[in-house]
């Protein structure tokens, strides 16, 4: 049973050790989840109070259900999406709130409504349950800090996979609710109800009703507060067309209203009595305007004007009133001047407007209500007054500000001013939903009126009214969709409303071309994490949660207890092993399913795509789950269909400034935001694909109007002046106001342009000149910059897909002149040229295209007639192309961020300039900081306004007026003086000290530095306090005075009251109480001293900053600025007074409102400055002294008693006889000793009677002691007992008995003299023991520094002590017992044999236990032989020091503990290992490898063979053998550079000027090409059986030598195929034609099963599965396939013979007749007849390069789908033909010759591979028999093979036996026959007129065919080709599925079953030797002991660099990767190193 418990205890203890903290954390966080005391808890308590237990439990259950829903929403996303949408909770709360409100208002009619009803069927139960549920879903309000709730949710989500944490948290959460229920029941039922029912004088029913109403009021208040923070659910006031018309009409009359205001002001200046009446009139007008604006939507513009008028009149009235009161001559003169100015302006206007305004004022005078509020609103909006003249408006504003300050200071009615300030604060804080919304509506109306009035002022033409409507449409962007089409929740909410609280951040004055703020909101957050030793990007948490994660990360190691008990690598290795096993099982299951006949599409693992809630998946380009080459690139597309939306954003920002002709604006497109048609990118996206203009098609001629000359013309000698070229553009794009400024700048440009090289320099000069002026030039500087960029803009030298001729014609034939009316272009412009322009120039081009298309549409609509059906059809088609088609899905997925219109800040910008419009709005719509007061300083004509802001943090600044508070942050409300606004979530971080203690610092130097820094900081603080206390106090006092201006009066009164209470009541009462206590304690009273000290205390009135004023008087304006009361020599109550009088020291403090003291004004109370600060301290000191004295006396007495007792015990133990001396000791064998003991004992028992004691001298001499007999009743029992004991002693271990016995005798002999030496030795030991604490302290300090490893060390130390002490204590007890046996005291106690036997029985049991635990148990016993006394040793010569030394070393030293160091695998970083040991272990690789391999550095061939052998590209081997390989790589790149040589050698002036700036770019392209070669060489490196034999095939890639190039005929032509991925290599190697097929996914290697890696040639795709393959099925199928192959080859040989003869006959005929060219033309005509082809011959010179992309496009354009399908069918027929005669018959009937040659070529290729595989030296097929001339002459191009092999989805790409199977040959021909015809025509088009070349010119004209795929620009040509050829790929995939099942292993790669990422993971894990590394969970026995490891003499020279090379070599080199990363992926850092897809070749351990 004990063993079973011992076995169970280890796993149980480990589980408790690991899971204990998790369970505690779960209980803790589950319990604190119930702590937030919100409305649900209040509601539950109310239910307990009113409804007793039943109602309370129901309410609690509703709350629990709500909390469960919240928790489940974290794990189940649909619940979260349903509940936490923006307005879901609001829609849920609103009806419940209304029901609660109506229910609380109604009075209960019967007592049943307040008394409980104990029935579950009561309908109130549902109401209670829903109440608790709804209230729980809302945010807690009483707990303002949301950290607790977030923390609980975060932990529940983070540890959701830990079942222990979840169960414990659930238990804690349930326990918290149970505790709350019991506490509430205790409070409500036992205490409250008991007291209410028995002791309350109020009726029980009435009291319950009061409680019911009280809680209802609390809940309603909570609901109101919650709804006040949420946005309004309905739309704001909308402006329909009628409102806009009314606003436009009222805007015209606004100027007359302004004149009427000036007229009224003149009248008020003349008459003082009319001031009050006019003020009343203004009040009435303001109220009337507000009421009209609120009640009548249609009269908003009218109400706006009336409110403006009323406010302005009231301000002018105040101004006149202050002028009349002050009688200041300057102000009076200024007011008279202003009145004259107003009168002159008013006389110029229409008197009808004045009459209308007067009538309006009379009408509004009768609607006066609430005078104080209207005055406050009028003062709030005091800057509404507007005037045409800027100076008049400024004087009015300044005078209003001055008079307002004077009225605040001197007005008799001060309460009115206070009410005004309070009303402003209330309007801004409390009535946000009402007043600020009105201000938004009024501000919108003002902006509308302002813009429309500007248009009226600019042009008085009545037609301008029509212009205002589209301009208004242009400003109101983003019109919402129809209300009925929107989803249900969105119908009632406006996401684009203006009053959303978004802050305005302006970054530059030219923010029109730059977004002011971010317009997108991030939905996903990404972060870096480590995977496979690399940093990768993945999804992460919110930024707010990351802050908490950083804090928790510091304590993660402390919380993780598992790392203390086990190796941290164990868990990782175990996890990786499980991962590998799971992948292996999954892979095997999929292979089994495939072998059982399951379709491949069901077996292959599918990638997880990123999709939305509707199930729509992202494209690969936008899928964030993809990376690297799988995702593709976005920035390389250069198609006009995929233009970036940057142009859209720029045009939207320019829409307010670019002026479009009126006729285009009035007839704009429907739903057009800008008034001049869609943007060109959106416009082209809406067109159909076939109607889109292709890159080689010309654009409309009218688009040239927007293209200004952008290059220098070659036909003119000098440059045309800039002004003539810029002015037509300025007429179109620059506003009218800036034309004069622009003309002035143009003249400056013409004069200074000759001195400058670049216009950019002049542009910078103009910028500096503009910034120095104060006019509106700053605003219009943008147009000058645009004009410069448009006029002088160099074309980019790289034009996509353009050759030399197109490029030259585009530049030479560009416009020669341009004017504003007519443009006569002489050339064509194509998309390539447009795409190379800058973004700004493309904008104007697209604008012109939009206008052009709309002009055509308008003309067609005007000229259309019903009779002409053709014209009608064209018009309808054009209309549908432009407007009606659905746009293509090329838009980016974005989340819109609502923001205000772009003209929101316009009024504020316009207010900064000197030139103001007729109506100027001076009030800003963006909130500014709260201003406390203003101070205006006059310096002559200039004025400076000093503003005093509130010290309180204002989180509403930089927000739009009227915005709601739903999105605002929660801030602390208990600190009024708060310098910065911050969230409570980060409050804990702010409280961290400036210099926190670094608990993880292990260096003393760092601590010293921190201590020095802290010391300096303390000194600075100390210096600042005592050297300049006045400045410090003054600063704080000023801050507090500014923060509390309204409470200084009451605070001063409280301070005076506290001063009197302290001096007259508190201090005397304390003195009396103290002295009464002294009298009761029989002490003398101290009344005199206390009264004297109390009188010394002085109370002085001071200012707010602590400046002393007077003892009795008050400082000036104390009620406004505050005051302080300073206590000099404050009284301190003392328990007693000392006799020696100390010198008085000046002390002071300040009194607080609560009666406490503080050291600074407005400071916090200080406990050290209280009355009792010196009262308890002396008492505590005296008590401490008494306690110390008592403890000392008690300790002395106790020690004396213990010493006396110790002496008595010592005397009794030692006895008085001492120890007898033994004369001699000799060596006795163990067997002899046992026999003598046994015989002697037996003889004594036989001869001696019972009870007698006879001493045996012989035995006593040997053992050194005397024996006594034991009285035993039965002698037989005694004999048997002694025999058993002696035998048991002998059985245990004879050597310890003998050794110990003899050692005891030796010890006895040495210690027989006296105990003096023993005493001295004990004293020495006592000294050593006293040194132990010091050593322990030193070790403790070291362990604290290495605290990370202290726990491991302690555990290691305990394990060592467990073994060391156990064995040592056993032997120590045995030796000491035997030592004391020889004393006289033992002899008197009993028989020696009994005691000795018992001791060794115990030793036997313990030894059996320890023998299994201690590994070197027997070696310890062997070491003990040193203690044995030999006969030749002299016992007397041994000293006692040596004897006691042996006693202390008698315990076994367990040196096997070092294996625990090895177990932790800490390697050289372990801090507890000495440096020398580290070096030794590092050299011998003891900590890392069990069996290090003996490899040398120089013998690289030996360790290179350890790797899997691969055949690498020459680029890699260029570093291995540079002299042999370096030049060949460079030669391959030279041909690519030669293509750009003609660009540099051109002598044409225009061409040279254009290409010269791009030479650097060309060099970069050349460098990128070389890096492309290097990169693809890494990706496409192939495997070879012997890596050292690569030099044999080295000459294959050397294509520039004559010997390596196939001898071609004179009519042959080698094409430039470097842009394609599949390349035809025509090489001569043993007269054999070899075809190289290269692609990025070339034959994926069998990494999962290395035995499948067969021989592979770099130019041969075939593989041969070895005979030892694990795929037995493939072995069986291979035999069948070989037979079929042989039969098919026979048929192919027959076909070859027939066709070869026919080809030779045709050669003879062509040479005789010389009609080769005629036959070429005839064959072309035959093709045109049969297939309907239209081929245009291109006549170019012999050096013309073939543009492959254009040719492919023309082929696909000309060939229809039907023709291609016919070709495929014909190909199928030809393949099935077996009769040669029938084959020739079809051939004679004009069947396409290229198709025939393709079939022949395919058969030849298969036949050639078969011959080469059978016999490498066979040359049955000669290249001269089938010459390249035959292929090219008969229109067989290299693209035949190229198009055939270029399909990335070819099923034979990864086939090991694809070329050997019959079915796959058929499929390959069926699929690839389609592309052959297309490439036939390609070759014919490109080679029709190519002249013949000589054989010696061939090497010069050959462009090297690179064996690697190069990157190319994705242009329109390639896109169109891919789209057209997509159905071919799908057809190929469809046919691939119809193949024979028996060939599945030969046509499918097993590794493709898994995804690439999981495949790569499986490869790496499969290479890890996880089972043989002994790194899992293993025993300590398997680890070698340190003695064995340290004793090894073998030194292994395994260097670290060699290990790294062994892992990396020969896969890749890091320095090459860095360079390749920079040029291939266009990055300068290593952020995209993961995209390289480099395969790691691990070590192949055999």
Swiss-Prot record:
Bilayer topology: Multi-pass membrane protein
UniProt KW keywords: Chloroplast, Membrane, Plastid, Plastid inner membrane, Protein transport, Transmembrane, Transmembrane helix, Transport
Record's compositionally biased regions (Low complexity): 1833-1866
TM helices/strands, residue ranges: 18-38, 54-74, 79-99, 125-145, 163-183, 214-234
Biological-process GO terms, alphabetical: protein transport
Compositional bias of kind Basic and acidic residues: 322-335, 344-368, 378-457, 1882-1898
Cellular location(s): Plastid, Chloroplast inner membrane
GO CC annotation terms, alphabetical: chloroplast inner membrane
Metal-binding among keywords: no
Region named Disordered: 278-299, 320-472, 1833-1898
Subunit structure: Part of the Tic complex.
PANTHER family: PROTEIN TIC 214, PROTEIN TIC 214-RELATED
Its job: Involved in protein precursor import into chloroplasts. May be part of an intermediate translocation complex acting as a protein-conducting channel at the inner envelope.
Family, similarity comment: Belongs to the TIC214 family.
This protein's name: Protein TIC 214
UniProt organism field: Pinus koraiensis
């Amino acid at each position: 049973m004990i063993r079973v418990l011992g076995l169970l205890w280890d796993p149980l203890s480990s589980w408790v050790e690991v899971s204990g903290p998790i369970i505690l954390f779960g209980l803790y966080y589950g319990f604190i989840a119930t702590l937030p005391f919100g409305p649900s808890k209040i509601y539950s308590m109310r239910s307990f109070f009113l409804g007793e237990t039943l109602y309370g439990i129901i309410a609690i259950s509703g709350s629990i259900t709500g909390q469960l829903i919240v928790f489940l929403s974290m794990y189940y996303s649909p619940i979260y999406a349903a509940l936490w949408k923006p307005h879901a909770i609001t829609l849920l709360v609103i009806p419940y709130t209304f029901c609660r409100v109506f229910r609380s208002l109604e009075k209960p009619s019967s007592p049943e409504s307040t008394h409980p009803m104990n029935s579950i069927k009561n309908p109130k139960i549902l109401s209670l349950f829903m109440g608790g549920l709804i209230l729980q879903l809302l945010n807690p309000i009483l707990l303002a800090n949301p950290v607790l709730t977030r923390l609980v949710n975060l932990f529940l989500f983070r540890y959701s996979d830990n079942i222990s944490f979840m169960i414990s948290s659930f238990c804690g959460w349930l326990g918290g609710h149970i505790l709350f229920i019991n506490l509430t029941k205790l409070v409500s039922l036992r205490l409250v109800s008991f007291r209410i029912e028995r002791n309350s004088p109020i009726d029980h029913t009435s009291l319950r009703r009061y409680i019911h109403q009280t809680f209802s009021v609390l809940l309603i208040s909570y609901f109101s507060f919650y709804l006040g923070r949420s946005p309004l659910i309905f739309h704001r006031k909308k402006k329909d067309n009628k409102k806009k018309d009314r606003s436009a009409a009222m805007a015209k009359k606004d100027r007359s209203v302004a004149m009427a205001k000036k007229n009224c002001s003149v009248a008020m200046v003349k008459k003082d009595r009319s001031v009050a009446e006019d003020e009343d009139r203004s009040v009435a007008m303001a109220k009337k305007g507000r009421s009209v604006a609120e009640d009548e939507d249609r009269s908003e513009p009218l109400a706006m004007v009336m409110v403006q008028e009323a406010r302005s009149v009231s301000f002018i009235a105040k101004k006149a009133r202050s002028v009349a009161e002050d009688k200041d001559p300057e102000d009076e003169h200024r007011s008279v001047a202003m009145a004259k100015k107003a009168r002159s302006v008013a006389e110029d206007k229409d008197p009808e407007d004045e009459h209308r305004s007067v009538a309006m004022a009379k009408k509004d005078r009768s609607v006066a209500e609430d005078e104080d509020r209207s005055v406050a609103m009028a003062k709030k909006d005091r800057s509404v007054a507007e005037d045409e003249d800027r100076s008049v408006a400024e004087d009015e504003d300044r005078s209003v500000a001055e008079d307002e300050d004077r009225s605040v200071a001197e007005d008799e009615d001060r309460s009115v001013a206070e009410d005004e300030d309070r009303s402003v604060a209330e309007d801004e804080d409390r009535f946000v939903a009402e007043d600020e919304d009105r201000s938004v509506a009024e501000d919108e109306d003002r902006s509308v009126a302002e813009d429309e009035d500007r248009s009226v002022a600019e042009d008085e033409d009545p037609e301008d009214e029509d212009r205002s409507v589209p301009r208004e449409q242009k400003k109101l962007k983003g019109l919402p969709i129809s209300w009925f089409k929107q989803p249900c929740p969105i119908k009632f909410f406006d996401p684009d409303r203006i009053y959303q609280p978004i802050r305005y951040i302006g970054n530059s004055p030219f923010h029109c071309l730059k977004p002011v703020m971010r317009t997108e909101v991030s939905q996903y957050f990404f972060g870096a994490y480590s995977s496979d030793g690399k940093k990768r990007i993945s999804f992460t948490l919110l930024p707010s949660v990351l802050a908490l994660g950083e804090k928790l990360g510091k304590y993660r190691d402390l919380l993780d207890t598992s790392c203390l008990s086990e190796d941290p690598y164990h868990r990782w290795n175990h996890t990786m092993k499980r991962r590998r096993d799971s992948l292996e099982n999954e892979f095997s299951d999929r292979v089994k399913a495939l072998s059982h006949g399951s379709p491949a599409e069901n077996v292959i693992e599918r990638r997880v795509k990123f999709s939305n809630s509707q199930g729509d998946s992202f494209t690969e380009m936008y899928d964030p789950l993809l990376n690297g080459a799988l995702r593709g690139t976005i920035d390389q597309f250069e198609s006009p269909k995929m233009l970036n939306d940057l142009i859209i954003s720029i045009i939207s920002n320019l829409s307010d400034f670019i002026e479009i002709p009126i006729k285009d604006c009035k007839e704009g497109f429907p739903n057009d935001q800008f008034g001049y048609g869609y943007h060109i990118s959106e416009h082209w996206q809406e067109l159909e694909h076939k109607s889109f203009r292709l890159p080689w098609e010309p654009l409309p001629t009218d688009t040239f109007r927007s293209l200004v000359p952008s290059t220098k013309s070659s036909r003119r000698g000098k440059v045309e002046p800039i002004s003539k070229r810029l002015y037509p553009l300025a007429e179109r794009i620059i506003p009218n106001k800036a034309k004069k400024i622009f003309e002035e700048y143009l003249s400056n440009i013409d004069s200074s342009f000759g001195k400058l090289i670049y216009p950019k320099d002049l542009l910078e000069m103009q910028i500096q000149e503009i910034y120095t002026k104060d006019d509106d030039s700053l605003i219009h500087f943008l147009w000058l910059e645009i004009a410069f960029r448009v006029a002088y803009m160099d074309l980019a030298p790289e034009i996509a897909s353009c050759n030399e001729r197109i490029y030259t014609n585009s530049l030479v034939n560009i416009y020669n002149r341009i004017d504003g009316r007519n443009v006569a272009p002489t050339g064509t412009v194509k998309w390539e040229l447009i795409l190379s322009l800058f973004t700004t120039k493309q904008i104007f081009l697209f604008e012109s295209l939009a206008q052009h298309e709309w002009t055509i549409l308008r003309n067609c609509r005007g000229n259309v007639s019903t009779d002409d059906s053709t014209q009608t059809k064209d018009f309808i088609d054009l209309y549908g192309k432009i407007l009606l088609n659905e746009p293509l899905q090329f838009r980016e997925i974005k989340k819109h961020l609502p923001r205000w219109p772009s003209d929101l800040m316009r009024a504020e910008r316009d207010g900064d300039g000197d030139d103001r419009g007729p109506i100027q709005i001076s009030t800003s719509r963006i909130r500014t900081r709260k201003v406390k007061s203003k101070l205006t300083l006059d310096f002559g004509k200039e004025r400076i306004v000093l503003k005093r802001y509130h010290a309180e943090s204002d989180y509403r600044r930089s927000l739009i007026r009227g915005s709601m508070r739903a999105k605002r942050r929660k801030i602390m409300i208990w600190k009024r003086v708060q310098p910065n606004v911050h969230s409570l979530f980060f409050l804990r971080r702010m409280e961290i000290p400036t210099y926190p203690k670094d608990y993880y610092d292990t260096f003393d130097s760092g601590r010293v530095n921190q201590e020095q820094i802290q010391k300096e900081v303390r000194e600075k603080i100390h210096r600042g306090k005592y050297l300049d206390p006045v400045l410090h106090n003054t600063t704080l006092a000023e801050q507090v005075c500014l923060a509390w201006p309204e409470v200084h009066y009451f605070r001063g009164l409280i301070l005076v009251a506290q001063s009197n209470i302290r001096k007259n009541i508190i201090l005397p009462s304390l003195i009396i109480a103290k002295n009464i206590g002294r009298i009761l304690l029989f002490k003398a009273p101290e009344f005199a001293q206390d009264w004297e000290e109390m009188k010394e205390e002085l109370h002085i009135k001071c200012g707010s900053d602590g400046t002393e004023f007077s003892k009795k008087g008050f400082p000036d304006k104390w009620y406004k600025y505050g005051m302080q009361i300073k206590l000099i020599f404050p009284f301190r109550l003392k328990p007693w007074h000392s006799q020696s009088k100390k010198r008085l020291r000046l002390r002071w403090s300040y009194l607080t409102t609560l009666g406490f003291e503080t050291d600074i004004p407005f400071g916090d109370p200080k406990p050290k400055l209280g009355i009792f600060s010196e009262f308890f301290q002396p008492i505590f000191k005296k008590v401490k002294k008494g306690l110390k004295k008592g403890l000392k006396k008690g300790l002395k007495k106790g020690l004396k008693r213990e010493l006396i007792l110790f002496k008595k015990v010592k005397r009794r133990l030692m006895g008085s006889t001492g120890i007898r001396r033994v004369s001699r000791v000799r060596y006795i064998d163990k067997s002899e000793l046992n026999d003598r003991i046994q015989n002697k004992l037996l003889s004594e028992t036989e001869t001696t009677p019972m009870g007698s004691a006879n001493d045996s001298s012989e035995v006593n001499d040997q053992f050194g002691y005397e024996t006594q007999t034991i009285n035993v009743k039965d002698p037989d029992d005694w004999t048997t007992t002694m025999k058993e004991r002696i035998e048991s002693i002998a059985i245990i271990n004879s050597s310890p008995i003998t050794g110990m016995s003899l050692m005891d005798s030796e010890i006895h002999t040495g210690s027989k003299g006296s105990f003096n030496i023993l005493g001295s030795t004990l004293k020495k030991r006592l000294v050593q023991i006293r040194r132990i604490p010091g050593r322990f302290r030193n070790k403790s300090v070291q362990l604290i520094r290495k605290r990370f490893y202290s726990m491991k060390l302690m555990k290691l130390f305990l394990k060592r002590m467990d073994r060391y002490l156990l064995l040592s204590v056993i032997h120590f007890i045995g030796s000491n017992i035997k030592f004391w046996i020889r004393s006289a005291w033992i002899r008197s106690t009993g028989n020696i044999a009994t005691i000795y036997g018992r001791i060794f029985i115990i030793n036997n049991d313990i030894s059996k236990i320890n023998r299994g635990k201690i590994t070197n148990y027997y070696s310890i016993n062997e070491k003990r032989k040193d203690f044995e006394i030999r006969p030749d040793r002299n016992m007397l010569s041994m000293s006692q020091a040596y004897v006691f030394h042996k006693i202390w070393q008698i315990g076994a030293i367990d040196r096997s503990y070092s294996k625990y160091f090895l177990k932790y695998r800490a390697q050289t970083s372990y801090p507890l290992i000495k440096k020398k040991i580290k070096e030794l272990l590092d050299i011998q690789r003891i900590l890392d490898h069990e069996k290090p391999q003996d490899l040398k550095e120089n013998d690289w061939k030996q360790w290179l063979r350890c790797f899997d052998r691969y055949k690498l590209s020459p680029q890699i081997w260029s570093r291995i053998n540079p002299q042999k390989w370096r030049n060949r790589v460079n030669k391959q790149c030279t041909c690519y550079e030669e293509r750009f040589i003609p660009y540099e050698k051109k002598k044409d002036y225009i061409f040279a000027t254009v290409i010269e700036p791009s030479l650097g770019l060309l060099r970069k392209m050349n460098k990128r090409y070389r890096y492309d070669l290097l990169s693809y060489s890494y990706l496409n490196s192939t495997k070879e059986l012997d890596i050292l034999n690569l030099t044999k095939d080295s000459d294959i890639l050397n294509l520039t030598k004559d010997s390596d190039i196939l001898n071609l005929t004179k009519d042959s032509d080698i094409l430039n195929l470097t842009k394609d991925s599949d390349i035809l290599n025509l090489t001569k190697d043993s007269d054999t034609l070899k075809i190289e097929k290269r692609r990025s996914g070339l034959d994926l290697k069998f990494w999962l099963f290395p035995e499948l890696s067969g021989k592979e040639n770099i130019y041969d795709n075939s593989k041969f599965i070895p005979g030892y393959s694990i795929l037995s099925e493939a072995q069986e199928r291979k035999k069948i396939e070989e037979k079929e192959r042989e039969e098919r080859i026979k048929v192919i040989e027959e076909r070859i013979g027939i066709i070869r003869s026919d080809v030779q006959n045709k050669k003879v005929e062509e040479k005789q007749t010389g009609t080769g060219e005629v036959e070429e033309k005839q064959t072309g005509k035959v093709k045109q007849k049969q297939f309907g082809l239209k081929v245009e011959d291109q006549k170019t010179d012999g050096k013309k390069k073939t543009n492959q992309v254009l040719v492919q496009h023309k082929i696909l354009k000309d060939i229809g789908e039907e023709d291609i399908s016919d070709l495929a069918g014909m190909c199928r027929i030809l393949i099935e033909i077996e009769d040669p005669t029938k084959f020739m018959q079809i051939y004679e009937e004009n069947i396409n010759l290229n198709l025939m040659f393709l079939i022949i070529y395919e058969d030849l290729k298969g036949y050639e591979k078969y011959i080469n595989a059978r016999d490498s030296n066979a040359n049955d097929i000669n290249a001269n028999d089938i010459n390249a001339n035959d292929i090219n002459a008969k229109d067989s191009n290299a693209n035949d093979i190229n198009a055939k092999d270029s399909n990335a989805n070819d099923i034979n790409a990864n086939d090991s036996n694809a070329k050997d199977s019959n079915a796959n040959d058929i499929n390959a021909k069926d699929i690839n026959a389609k592309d052959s015809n297309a490439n036939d025509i390609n070759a014919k088009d490109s080679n029709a007129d190519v002249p013949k070349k000589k054989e010696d010119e061939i090497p010069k004209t050959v462009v090297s065919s690179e064996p690697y795929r190069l990157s190319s620009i994705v242009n329109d040509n390639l896109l169109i080709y891919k789209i057209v050829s997509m159905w071919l790929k799908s057809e190929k995939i469809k046919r691939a599925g119809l193949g024979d099942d028996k060939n599945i292993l030969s046509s499918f790669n097993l590794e493709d079953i898994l995804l690439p990422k999981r495949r790569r993971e499986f490869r790496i894990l499969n290479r890890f030797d996880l089972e043989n590394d002994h790194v899992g969970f293993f025993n300590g026995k398997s680890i070698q002991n340190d003695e064995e490891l340290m004793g090894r003499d073998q030194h292994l020279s395994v260097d670290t660099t060699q290990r790294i090379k062994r892992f990396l070599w020969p896969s890749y080199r890091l320095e090459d990767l860095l360079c390749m990363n920079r040029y291939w992926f266009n990055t300068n850092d290593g952020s995209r190193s993961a995209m390289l897809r480099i395969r790691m070749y691990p070590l192949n351990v055999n």
